[in-house]
């Protein structure tokens, strides 16, 4: 069997499809399209719609070179192929062509290129265009054009898509369909159904920073957190200053997302200190104002903590705004903004400290400043014994050694006693909650006797006499 016949046997269904197109393409005279059918099969083109302009021109030249046809016959046959192609394009892609015509984009030459590309991709409606289709178009353009031309084509491509989106959201079903909801897919910010936001992104040269890939292999929890943060930022922050929003939030969040995926981090609220330090090294290579960009860590944790349906007691940082505390527990002149547990690197100890803090914040009546002070001292104790399985396994001798070291430091007796009191309260909590059977130290053994300290605030006679003489001036 010849190679051509073998190929035809393998492509039988595709060849039959092509034949049906010619038979039903509006040209009844078989002799006008018979050669065209053979030509396309030889080119391994099995759909007349997919024949490029170059193919059509070469078909005409093939007819001329064969010497079998007059110029009139060549013109008739080459025209027949074009007419059949046009018939099937309008039959199968008429709605797409209409949508492109209605898109209010004036550059017909660029629209024609886009139209041919979409037809080759089997796109029947503009709403089928997504970032993946755009990426394929961009890759195709880069093979033929310089950067400036590629950007011109893509600008028209994006305008066509954006016009389609705006038309769709004029109806209720369209608005529902375009409602932002998390899906494992790529989100391209210029394709959002918010015209004001879309305008902000038009002049961003590096469009990659506008691509948010939620299809990539990563923790679903992380991806949902980033999606929530992205939408919160777009909807609520710097709507009137897109440059500031980009620099302070969008770019740093993009870097943070990439970092977490690479590091296999699955929870932004569980970021550890050493992970944050590694991320900072990456940021240092990207911007001069590192401090500005690093605020994305605290901003992200805060947004997630404040917007969660339920309080995230497991979070490494708690934000007091979430708790709606009574005024008598707050100091309005110097309010405590957050309680941090990230400094406790032993995770079991951190969980115990969070339980203790949860009790004080939720049930106890101490002021938040007082709670923070207690937690600060307990954190020092926990970090000292971070190598142990947990603070519950630390015995009396180990604690005695720790307390003796505290005594050796230049610490006032009153300060030392306060620390012992903070520690005993923490241990009492662990004991009551059943984390340990008995408290491994007796506070009275360590508490020191203290005396009220008198602060001499007397002033010299010369000074107070001068004050008395000048009182009349006040």
State the predicted function of each range.
Residues 354, 382-383, 447, 460-464:
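Short hydrophobic/aromatic segments of transmembrane alpha-helices and their interfaces
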Residues 377-380, 445, 449:
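A generic structural signal for ordered alpha-helices
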Residues 395-399, 439-448:
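Long, charged, glycine-rich C-terminal linkers/tails
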Residues 9-20, 350, 450-474:
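Long, amphipathic, Lys/Arg-enriched alpha-helical "connector/arm" segment
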Residues 413, 436-445, 460-466:
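Short, highly charged low-complexity linear segments
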Residues 406, 431, 441, 448-451, ...:
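Short alpha-helical interface elements
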Residues 1-436:
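Charge-rich, intrinsically disordered N-terminal extensions
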């Amino acid at each position: 069997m010849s190679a051509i016949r073998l190929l035809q046997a393998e492509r039988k269904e595709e060849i039959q499809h092509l034949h049906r197109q010619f038979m039903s393409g509006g040209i009844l005279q078989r002799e006008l399209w018979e050669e065209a059918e053979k030509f396309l099969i030889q080119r391994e083109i099995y759909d007349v719609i997919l024949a490029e302009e170059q193919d059509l021109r070469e078909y005409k030249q093939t007819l001329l070179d064969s010497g079998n046809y007059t110029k009139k016959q060549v013109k008739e046959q080459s025209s027949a192929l074009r007419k059949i192609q046009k018939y099937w394009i309008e039959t199968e892609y008429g709605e797409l062509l209409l949508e492109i015509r209605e898109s209010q984009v004036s550059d017909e030459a660029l629209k024609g290129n886009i139209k041919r590309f979409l037809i080759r991709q089997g796109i029947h409606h503009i709403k089928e265009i997504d970032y993946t289709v755009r990426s394929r178009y961009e890759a195709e353009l880069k093979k033929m054009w310089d950067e400036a031309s590629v950007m011109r084509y893509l600008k028209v491509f994006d305008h066509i898509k954006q016009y389609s989106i705006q038309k769709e959201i004029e109806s209720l079903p369209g608005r529902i369909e375009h409602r932002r909801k998390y899906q494992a897919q790529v989100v391209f910010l210029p394709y959002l159904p918010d015209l004001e936001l879309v305008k902000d992104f038009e002049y961003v040269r590096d469009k990659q920073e506008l691509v948010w890939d939620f299809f990539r292999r990563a923790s679903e929890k992380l991806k949902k957190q980033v999606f929530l943060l992205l939408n919160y930022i777009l909807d609520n922050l710097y709507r009137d200053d897109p440059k500031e929003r980009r620099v302070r939030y969008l770019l740093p969040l993009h870097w943070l997302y990439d970092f977490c995926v690479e590091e296999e981090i699955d929870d932004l609220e569980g970021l550890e200190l050493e992970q944050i330090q590694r991320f900072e090294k990456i940021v240092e290579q990207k911007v001069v104002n590192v401090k500005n960009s690093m605020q994305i860590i605290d901003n992200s944790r805060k947004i997630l903590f404040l917007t969660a349906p339920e309080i995230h007691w497991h979070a490494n940082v708690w934000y007091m705004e979430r708790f709606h505390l009574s005024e008598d527990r707050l100091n309005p002149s110097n309010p405590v903004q957050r309680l941090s547990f990230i400094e406790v690197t032993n995770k079991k100890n951190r969980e115990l400290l969070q339980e203790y803090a949860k009790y004080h914040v939720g049930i106890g009546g101490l002021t938040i400043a007082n709670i923070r002070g207690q937690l600060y001292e307990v954190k020092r104790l926990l970090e000292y014994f971070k190598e142990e399985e947990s603070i519950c396994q630390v015995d009396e001798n180990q604690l005695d050694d720790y307390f003796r070291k505290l005594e050796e430091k230049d610490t006032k007796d009153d300060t030392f006693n306060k620390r012992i009191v903070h520690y005993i309260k923490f241990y009492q909590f662990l004991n009551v909650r059943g984390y340990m059977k008995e408290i491994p130290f007796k506070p009275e053994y360590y508490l020191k006797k203290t005396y009220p300290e008198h602060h001499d605030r007397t002033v010299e006679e010369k000074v107070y006499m001068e004050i008395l003489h000048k009182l009349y001036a006040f």
